[in-house]
Regions:
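Active-site-adjacent substrate/metal-binding segments within catalytic domains
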Residues: 22-156, 160
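Boundary at the C-terminal end of the N-terminal hydrophobic targeting segment
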Residues: 17-19
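Polysaccharide-binding and catalytic clefts of secreted carbohydrate-active enzymes
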Residues: 161, 165-188
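Sec-dependent N-terminal signal peptides
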Residues: 4-15
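Active-site-proximal flexible loops/turns
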Residues: 9, 53, 122, 172-176
Length: 188
């Protein structure tokens, strides 16, 4: 009985150790701010990455809907090249299953910075397409915050997920008017 209890505790500890995710934080001191992973300074050597074979585009490629064999072959080819280039972080977009973020990290040591467009290209609220996102609209705010909460919940504790990025140059394409923008200094 004593051995069974010890074995069970050892099993829980082992499973817990493998389920641990890296501790990511920002430190601030007199020298400035630094990203830290597991207490060590971390310099991002990163790039955007998406698997888009010749003859396809970001919409038609549907890479994550392929069979596991196709996905592994694509990842193994691409990630080994990135690793050889000393890339340590790739920027991917929502839609990548968490298990592939973990696969990339566990096999190649590459972290993922996961990007949610955060309304950059428009969004659908209550079944209505809104081409230009109005971030001051309470319904838009509620919708976007709900999407981010779901994103965080879905990817919580995913090994290899370094951080989230909300938006992609969301200031481009906006129509600004009003005292604040009209009084913006010309030299800035």
């Amino acid at each position: 009985m004593k051995n069974s209890i010890f074995g069970f505790i050892l099993l829980l500890f082992t499973v817990g150790a493998y389920a641990q995710t890296d501790q990511v934080s920002i430190s601030r001191d007199a020298d400035g701010m630094r990203l830290k992973v597991n207490g060590e300074d971390f310099m991002i050597n990163g790039m955007n990455w998406d698997y888009i074979p010749i003859g396809t585009n970001t919409i038609t490629a549907e890479f994550w809907k392929k069979s596991d064999d196709v996905i592994k072959a694509g990842l193994d080819t691409e990630m080994s090249l990135l690793k050889n280039m000393n890339v340590n972080v790739i920027r991917q977009y929502t839609g990548v299953p968490a298990r592939w973020i973990s696969y990339i990290y566990e096999k190649y040591g590459l972290y993922t910075l996961l990007t949610h467009s955060f309304g950059r290209y428009g969004l659908t609220i209550d079944g209505v397409w809104i081409e230009i996102t109005d971030y001051s609209d309470p319904r838009t705010q509620e919708f976007l915050l709900s999407e981010v909460e779901t994103l965080v919940r879905d990817y919580k504790d995913t090994p290899g997920l370094l951080m989230y990025l909300l938006g992609n140059e969301n200031n481009y394409g906006l129509f600004w008017a009003g005292a604040e923008t009209e009084d913006f200094p010309d030299d800035e």
